[in-house]
A protein has these predicted regions:
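Juxtamembrane/interface segments at transmembrane-helix termini
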Residues: 35, 62-68, 146-147, 155, ...
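Hydrophobic positions within alpha-helical membrane elements
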Residues: 107, 142, 175-176
Length: 183
């Protein structure tokens, strides 16, 4: 068990900076681009928060299924699940604030192409993807403020699946809506 604990701590120590560096570097690739909709400095913390957000949602989905199949209710308690849901509320709120910050920065910059890129995301040909992203990533996690939703396993699985669908839509919206037209 000593070796297990040592390796466990080592992997935890390695994976934390790995997550931070990978998502920060990818976000800088976008942020240093001149393509409207990508050229924003909010991307590094936004991508890291999104990674934590979607990671917790995926872990919750798999954990609750595993908990049920292998009858681990005595080991993985509602208390543990509720704490994870609180992290989803916090990171989902951070992602929501990042969406609003992106819109504000596009408006405040006065750059017409940036303003159009964000207006086009919400009302253009891919409006359905944008609003699906907002619904899944910002609105659905807010249901966890209600204790019944935070402690009912099938509702938690449903919301965490919505979060992961929303994070897929986020990548779609960032990449496709910015590249789908010429500026």
């Amino acid at each position: 068990w000593n070796h297990y604990e040592m390796v466990y701590m080592l992997l935890a120590g390695l994976s934390t900076p790995l997550v931070l560096s990978v998502h920060s570097i990818v976000s800088f690739d976008f942020a240093t681009s001149v393509i409207p909709g990508w050229h924003t400095t909010i991307f590094p913390p936004y991508f890291v928060a999104g990674a934590i957000f979607s990671g917790f949602a995926m872990v919750l989905t798999l954990m609750l299924i595993t908990r049920r199949v292998y009858k681990l209710e005595d080991y993985i308690t509602i208390y543990h699940i509720e704490l994870m849901n609180i992290i989803i509320i916090v990171t989902g709120s951070i992602v929501g604030v990042a969406y609003l910050t992106e819109l504000f920065m596009a408006w405040y910059s006065g750059v017409e192409a940036e303003q159009y890129a964000f207006y086009n995301r919400a009302t253009g040909p891919y409006w359905w993807a944008y609003w699906s992203m907002v619904t899944c990533n910002v609105i659905s996690p807010q249901l966890f403020w209600v204790k019944k939703f935070r402690t009912t396993p099938w509702i938690i699985v449903l919301i965490s699946i919505f979060v992961n669908i929303g994070m897929w839509f986020e990548r779609f919206v960032i990449v496709i809506t910015s590249l789908s037209r010429d500026y």
